Amino acid sequence: MWLTARDCRLDDLIALTSTTTDPATYPRASRITDGVVVYECADLAADASRPSSRLLLQAEIASALMDGPGIAVFAGAFEDASLIDSVSAVFEEIIAEQHRGGGPAGDHFGKPGSNDRIWNALEKLAVRAPDLFVRYYANDVVALASSAWLGPGYQTTSQVNVVNPGGTAQAVHRDYHLGFQPNEVAERFPAHVHDLSPGLTLQGAVAHCDMPVESGPTLYLPHSQRYGLGYLAWRLPEFREYFETHHVQLPLAKGDVVFFNPALFHAAGTNRTTSTRRMANLLQVSSPFGRAMETVDRELVVGSIYDDLRKGHASEGWDPQRIDNVIAASAEGYAFPTNLDRDQPIGGLAPMTQAELVARALAEDWDHATLVAALAAHVERTRTS
């Protein structure tokens, strides 16, 4: 029921990652490279265009992501290189503006400020270049893979990552959701949630330039997504060492797209070139599920109850657990979604939650006005610009 880091055994991961990817399981794939399923998108067009064969193709993709290597490459997903170049030019304009504006630069799993990052690139592209947005996100390979993993109604976000020449590799990790939680938090989620978390998100990347191995395309450990304790294991030294010696790394061409299970052990590689700015548009596609049925103004709720909650906190008769219970019922307990331009993950993987803010207010005995002002500022940071 409950998992702990003490339960992690490297031998269990080794047994899973020693699995051979069987080409017969993926009849529509063009090849298997270093255990990774590779599809030539030109060869998929006929199957993708017919409803019955499209479903079979999607089942194969989902199998590769869940039970197979956990990763699939779609070569030539964007056939029009000029479209990629035009979108890249918009991204470069945004990056140049960010440099002129200064300010802190947060990042996930990498050294802040060492590379270039555009948060909420999807919205920024739509506002700046709606014609390019329409052509770019009309891509059927992105929709094919996203709906294969998540079904209909998914939501797409994107963050552009540019690894500059000399940019160093990320630390191995798993991704959103549980991958963003420290072990002491991840251990509080029951085992079945560890199993369910990968089904809420699909990770992808569009190559916006040719990415030879020396430019540091992403490192992957095929089949590692099947390790049930992986969200607690990836920070452990022996697991990191194993990743460093057993990962695979595939070169990509401009317009290729990679999709992978967010539970796959992976990390961006070191850019050893002197001139290649390795640009990828990182797609994070989310399930329509995982949301509450009703919209609740939690800022209003917390502001309304704070004085009574503060009295309870000050009372010797109140168990601290009961205070935590009230905070859980009233405040937003998750840091996402947020605006990562204003609410950056500096010093960690996730910004402060509203619930953590309320707990701090009680611990420091803030008055009502101070709490209300802090809540308003917190909500403002999370809003899109």
Positions of predicted regions on the chain:
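Double-stranded beta-helix
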Residues: 185-188, 197-267, 289-292
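Active-site-adjacent segment of 2-oxoglutarate/Fe(II) JmjC oxygenases
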Residues: 284-337
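Fe(II)/2-oxoglutarate
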Residues: 1-67, 326, 333-337, 344-385
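Short secondary-structure boundary/capping segments
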Residues: 90-91, 172-177, 220-223, 235, ...
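A short hydrophobic beta-strand segment most commonly corresponding to one strand
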Residues: 222, 275-291
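Short beta-strand His + acidic residue motifs that chelate non-heme Fe in jelly-roll/DSBH
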Residues: 266-274
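Non-heme Fe(II)-dependent double-stranded beta-helix
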Residues: 17-183
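A structural signal for short, well-ordered beta-strand segments
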Residues: 160, 204-206, 281-285
